[in-house]
Structures are given as C-alpha cells and as structure tokens.
Amino acid sequence: MKKIALLLLILGAGIKGYTQVNPDSIEIIRGPYGVPHIYAATDVEVAYGFAWAQAEDHFKLIQEAYIAGNGILSKHIGLKGAGADFLVQFIQAEKTVDAQFHTLDKKFIALLEGFTQGLNAFAKKHPKEILKNELFPLTPKKLLRYTQLQLFISNGADKLVKGIVNNELSWPYEIEQDTKGSNLLAISRSRTQSDETFLAINTHQPLE
C-alpha cells in the first residue's frame, strides 16, 4: 500500500477559514487499486485530504467543472463555453448562493471550507497545472455556484431554456419520466476478495 503523508502549509493570506486545518495530521493511504483512504482527526481535515486526493487524480476535470459553474468557461475554451456561461447568468447562480448561504449549517460550510483549502493548497503546490488563475482561490460559494448549474442541467432545465431561445418549445411541454443515474461501477470478481461481482451506482440525484 502506498502511504502519502501531506506535509504542506495552509495557504495564508487570502484564505479566511471557518476552521483551522492541520495538513500534517492528514494521511492519504492508497490501496492496491489506487483508491485513496483519508485519515485525519476531524471531518474538516478529511475533507481537505479528500480534495487533495481528488486533485491528484483529476485536477483538470475539477477545475473545468468549477470554471463552468462560475461563468468563466468561455474565457477558458472560447465560444464553445458561452452556453454554460449564459446559463450561469440566467439562473443567477451567484445571486442565489449569496442570498441563501446564511441558511446553510455551519458544519457543512466548514466541510466546504476544508475541501476548498485542500484544492487551493494543491493549486499552490502545482501552479503549472492551473487552468485559469481567476478561479483561485476557491471558496465555498464558488463550489456552490457550480452546484446550482449542475442541478439545473441534471434536471433537464437547460433543454427548456434552449427551446425558449430557439422558439422550439411546444406546449404543453412533456417532461421525461425516465430515471437516470451516473457513475455506474461494475467490479469484476477477479478484483474482489470474495470472488463476487459487484455493481454500484451513485445517482447524485434522487430517483423520485
């Protein structure tokens, strides 16, 4: 098993955390198949370590998601990103997050803060991998803006907007009733100690 000890400094100026994270107390242990297991004294530190491990595996993908969620995708990929930027403005993601942020549980906000600190620390450690400097430092609100866009698209509302813009929306509009999921994982029996095949699904969204 590969054991990685995080010996990092928390980003100083520019990050006002809800809770202090001690990176020295965080361990990321990867199993034989590379799956990261995070060990730390607090949930917030686990969130920090989780963010770091995720960034190790796909920092580019994480950035692209938050770039889109914060309305700057066209600055990254050009005109192809204009649609996502339009949707972010259309749903008023920033305004919604600012207005509702105070309703969130402080413990949840602390987890978001730990996660963002982990990503920011990784970005500072690997500056050449940063796609858009404008995205950093990440904050809990920036994460939540992406969530607004994600939920909007996951529920198919972007298709409604497209229909309205192109004047192609028929009435009455029928919503698709089929259930969808994502991250469907099939694990071969050759990779399990019990010699069994497993099928796991992470839907992200409610099935009802």
Language model region names:
Residues 1-21:
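Bacterial Sec-dependent N-terminal signal peptides
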Residues 22-208:
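Substrate-recognition/specificity elements adjacent to catalytic centers across diverse enzyme folds
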